[in-house]
Each structure stands twice: as C-alpha cells, then as structure tokens.
C-alpha cells in the first residue's frame, strides 16, 4: 500500500511539473520582438499596407508592449497559461488571446473582435 501511495504521488508531481514546465517554455519562447506578417478576419486575409507597423514585444520580466496602426500603443503585463495569452494593460483591463501556434520563429494568435474571429501571424525579429 505504501509503494502504491508513493507511486501515485510521483505520478501526480510529474504531471504537475510537466504543466508548469510547458508554461515556462511558452513564456520563454514568447519573449522577444514580433512583427505582424499576416492578419485574417473570418478566415479571409486582410490586405493592409500598414501591417509592418504592428509590433508585439515581450520581455522576461512579464511585461509587454504593442504598437498598432494609427499610432495605437499599449503596454502592461502578460502571462501564458496553457494555450492562452493573457494581456493586462496599464488600466488593469485583461484580454485573453488563444495561442494557435508558438515556436522560436512564428507566433499565431486568435482573438474575437466585434463578433469576428481575427487571426494574427507574427514573425520573430529579435530575442
């Protein structure tokens, strides 16, 4: 019985560590400067000449900044949990974005905006 209890505790701790290490890896991979390369709205690509002005930056202290079109800027704290990216701006407003894909070169985010699904594809420019 003692061996079974020890094994159960080990399995539980292993699962717990794997979840926390996944979040650590995602937080580590997202750190850097990301430039938008494509934007889709309801699966249709948007042709936008100002796409290169959209920049997302994440640092290893949990801070983010966003520069968009029309001189829109935002900054605050971020957190990655599972496949979600939580952004909390300086006014303490939180947004949740779905991470469709994240690796060392590409970030794909999904969000709902005015009842429309928006997909933003970013390419990493700096670590």
Model regions and ranges:
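Lipid interaction determinants
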Residues: 22-75, 81-127
């Amino acid at each position: 019985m003692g061996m079974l209890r020890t094994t159960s505790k080990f399995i539980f701790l292993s699962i717990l560590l794997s979840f926390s290490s996944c979040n650590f890896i995602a937080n580590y991979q997202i750190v850097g400067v990301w430039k938008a390369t494509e934007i889709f709205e309801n699966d249709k690509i948007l042709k936008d000449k100002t796409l290169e002005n959209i920049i997302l930056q994440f640092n290893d202290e949990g801070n983010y900044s966003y520069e968009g079109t029309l001189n829109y800027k935002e900054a605050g704290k971020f957190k990655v949990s599972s496949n979600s990216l939580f952004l909390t701006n300086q006014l303490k407003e939180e947004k949740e974005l779905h991470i469709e894909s994240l690796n060392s070169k590409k970030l794909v985010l999904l969000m709902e905006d005015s009842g429309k699904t928006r997909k933003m594809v970013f390419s990493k420019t700096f670590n």
